[in-house]
């Protein structure tokens, strides 16, 4: 606003000066012309009056530099830099190490030292009084000979008959009636059946733990000789079961078995099958 008023004042003062200057010049010219014609006192007075007018002192305008107003523009906020997505390298899944198949642990074979169990009790013949004359020999194998067989054994007895007096006779005591002419076929068959049961019982107790756990079965046919004392010697495998451990267990069971002395006429060489089965 101040600049606008100053401009108006400047223009008006210039205009007034121009008017005054023009009027002054015109008066001077008129006065010169009048003087030339004869100066009149009126023109002189007018000129003097004009000259006597006080000149209006016009103050020089202050030149104000009109600098354009500068508005401090707020800097536009820079857009937030969008962070570039960090691409992680795709990790390949680590291959799991292949587990080695575990070998089946071999169970430790515990050697069970078992005392020979007697399935049947041996009754020693007492050589006293009239019983000694009859040569009564008790039958230690249950069910081996019953009924008439026992009567035959008693009737065949004599003072010279063999009696099972040893405690090492084991699981077999045939009806060893004191018959000097030899044992009957029934006695031999009963002795052989009792021998086979004794071997089977011993083999069941000697069943290898590993084969039992793996449910290995088989039949081993053994051949051996019975000594006069009832010990099994020269044990061999005539027919293998297909498993060496079962064969070895059968041989060990036979060698550890001791029975009563065989009856007279019993063949020394015997063949017995041993069956390993899981019940």
UniProtKB/Swiss-Prot annotation:
Basic and acidic residues bias (residue ranges): 89-120
List the membrane topology term(s): Single-pass membrane protein
Q: Which GO terms describe its molecular function?
A: energy transducer activity
Q: Does the keyword Methyltransferase apply?
A: no
Protein name in the entry: Protein TonB
The chain positions of domain TonB C-terminal read 192-279
State where the protein is found.
Answer: Cell inner membrane
Q: Where are the transmembrane segments?
A: 8-27
Q: Has the keyword Nucleotidyltransferase been applied to this entry?
A: no
NCBIfam families tied to this protein: tonB_Cterm
Recorded name of the encoding gene: tonB
UniProt-listed Pfam families: TonB_C, TonB_N
